[in-house]
Amino acid sequence: MFKKCILILAASCMMYSCATQTESNPFLTEFQTPNGVPPFDKIKLEHYEPAFQKGIEEQNANIQAIIDNTEAPTFENVIVALDNSSPTLDRVGGVFFNLTEAETTDELTALSMKLAPTLAEHEDNISLNQELFKKVDAVYSQKDALGLTREQQRLLEKTHKKFIRSGANLPADKQARLREINKQLSTLGITFSNNILNENNDFKLYVGKEEDLAGLPQWFRESAMAEARATGQEGKWLFTLHNASRLPFLQYSANRPLREQMYKAYINRGNNNDKNDNKKIIADIVRLRLEKAQLLGFDCYSNFVLDNTMAKNSTAVMDFLNNLWSYALPKAKAEAAELQKLMDKEGKGEKLEAWDWWYYTEKLRKEKYNLEEEEIKPYFKLENVREGAFAVANKLYGITLTKLEGIPVYHPDVEVFEVKAADGSQVGIFYVDYFPRPGKSGGAWMSNYREQQGSIRPLVCNVCSFTKPVGDTPSLLTIDEVETLFHEFGHALHGLLTQCQYKGTSCLLYTSDAAD
């Protein structure tokens, strides 16, 4: 009787523990938030790993159910079931992998390194599962007789090809080697990216003399002074490798040695023979990618990647680039000669170098067209440009974007908009994250926190690296940055306006060279 009571008590404790974990870990159930947005205010570092583990267990069980199904394989009970097999992984992965790019920390990076081999193994366990592939192949073999819609045909084709490209047809010994390669590549890629991010963050060009700021616009000086003040360097100016700092510095700084220092620091990221050096990592990645491609029947990795794109092979790509090169190279040489003439007028006997290009291009624009980019920027206040992009979307598609307050975000810079169609129905939720910071990768991109699927509306984000407002000076965009905002918003519209029945055919799941 005593033992029975102990067992009952233990079982009760286990049930309570599981219930408590489910209640406290927001990833383990559908998000209980307006519009199902991620509850960033409740998500903690310790939630990710158990959620990934639970997601793996859940998908394994769902896949086993597909395999154990005694009915004849069909599009619904195999392809659709597989497409819907990972709700928890989709939830936690949608947040985790976005934040490792937009708001990472040392702890998040370490966790990413820890999880990468496990997730790579899980992916291989699915792709190399022979019983599952037999069912996928059985459906694929009768594709022409199934009366599928174009979208269903696309999902079936993508699913089957993914298994083939992942090694489902390889013999056991080659599959084992492929697993090891994928495991190594999963961590090498993270290390490479993290080293670049570290190099971006580690480089700090402090300027202590005002004469060394010659040529720099006043707004840029104020921004650099605010950056220095934030690091405890009062009375100095701080310039970094983030686009919003590096590019204006190269464009306006009259101090050639400092331009050279800035340019070389950027170009040599991962090439400084220090803890962030990427040379061996690059060599390992190239070697493993080549071996992987050859295992899968391709002569090189580029042909393996391009086989899944519109271009199809590296020959087509090189033909395109070589044709472009025949026109671009003479033009570039003519522009370089023009810039060199401008340098020669200064009588310093200097030869045009890469770190001179932006600076003398700006001077040439002034001399040739009486136009300076600084004269244009006041017309491109960030908020005005964004509203312009929203207005274009309204004119083209009838949608409206309204700012939402009180929605959880992962950083104070992030803003959230609700997107509605002309009839008032919801199109999706749109996040914007426009300014650089130490935990954020450089560049600009669009991504999803949730894919559109049937009646499920997408959660889409744009992440950029525009100049932050300083004091009373708003964020003013260059022409290139205006183009970037519209470009990334175009990708966001693709994600928001997607109307697909299946997750596997939704916005981000098209060929990479069709994207831009």
Which residues are covered by each model-predicted region?
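Sec-dependent N-terminal signal peptides
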Residues: 5-13
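Conserved small/polar residues in nucleotide/adenosyl-binding loops
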Residues: 510-515
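Active-site-proximal, well-structured secondary-structure segments within enzyme catalytic domains
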Residues: 155, 187, 194, 199-240, ...
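C-terminal motif of bacterial Sec signal peptides marking the signal peptidase cleavage site
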Residues: 16-17
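N-terminal helix-rich structural modules
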Residues: 22-216
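Short His/Asp/Glu-rich catalytic/ion-coordination signatures at enzyme active sites or charged loops
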Residues: 32-47, 96-115, 139-180, 240-280, ...
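Active-site recognition of the HExxH zinc-binding catalytic motif
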Residues: 480-495
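C-terminal, non-catalytic "cap/extension" segments appended to globular domains
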Residues: 21-47, 54, 261, 367, ...
